[in-house]
Amino acid sequence: PRVTAIDLEGEYPEAFLRAAGQLGAFAGVVAPEFGGSGKGIADTIAQMAKIGETCLSTAFTHWCQTACARYIQLSDNAAAKAEFLPALASGRQLGGTGLSNTFKSCCEIERFLLTAKRVEGGYEINGTLPWVSNLGDDHIFVTGCPVDGDGRLLFFIVQCKQPGFKLVDGAHFTALEGTRTLACQFRNVRIADSRVLAHPEQSTEYLQRIQPGMILAQLGMGIGLIRDCIRLIDSAGRTHQHINCYEDDQADDLRAALAAAEA
């Protein structure tokens, strides 16, 4: 495993992600007609948990990838589904989720950092998102922001190589170095209507569709980490059980609680 290189040296597990896609690790959130398996959130959580048993950062990038695919799958944009979903499901296209600021701003935790202006054939986007993960020059991601003069939200696909858009690597993280978490600068970035997942009049219903699964799917990271912690407790118990037996929570207790939660 490349865990040390990923965590300490910032190695991005791109080769693994693309190989995982070929094995179907991202296919659960994509319908069969677009190259997925259609197995749903439960399959996505299971795949993510398996990865998380070894590397939580890589499990996080799996969540980013599947969240991106799911946002597109749950939109009404048939052309975008046909264009992007087969490649996202197979790992040929990698993608991120840039909706943290959108969701937090809807809850008045943050202010919106992007603005959209309606122009002929699409929208013009300006602003900066400080943290978006699982990105690269040939990646895509989904984000959302209010439209000037309207106030309602616009959700759309961003291609990292498009004019006016810039990725900035200006931060160092304790545990996210290998996740390609970058700042995203928008300077009059043109988003065509063909890249819009929800126009303002569609945004309330669209947000209700995507938000529950976006949160629920993150369980996969936690489950994988807990499994690995139990493994470490078992391993330590082979030499230190005479001391560890006094801990309030034993491996079997945690195993039972996890099994109940997964059931």
Roles of regions detected by a PLM:
Residues 12-128, 133:
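Glycine-rich flavin
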Residues 171-259:
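Glycine-rich beta->alpha junctions and the first turn(s) of the following alpha-helix
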Residues 113-115, 140-144, 155-157, 181-188:
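Conserved hydrophobic/aromatic beta-strand scaffold that supports enzyme active sites
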Residues 128-162:
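DPxDG-like acidic metal-binding loop motif
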Residues 106-108, 117-118, 133-136, 147-150, ...:
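Solvent-exposed alpha-helices and their adjacent loops that cap or buttress functional pockets
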Residues 47, 125-127, 156, 186, ...:
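Buried hydrophobic positions in well-ordered alpha/beta secondary-structure cores of metabolic enzymes
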Residues 102, 113, 169-176:
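Short Gly/Thr-rich strand-loop-strand
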Residues 261-263:
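Long, low-complexity C-terminal extensions of enzymes
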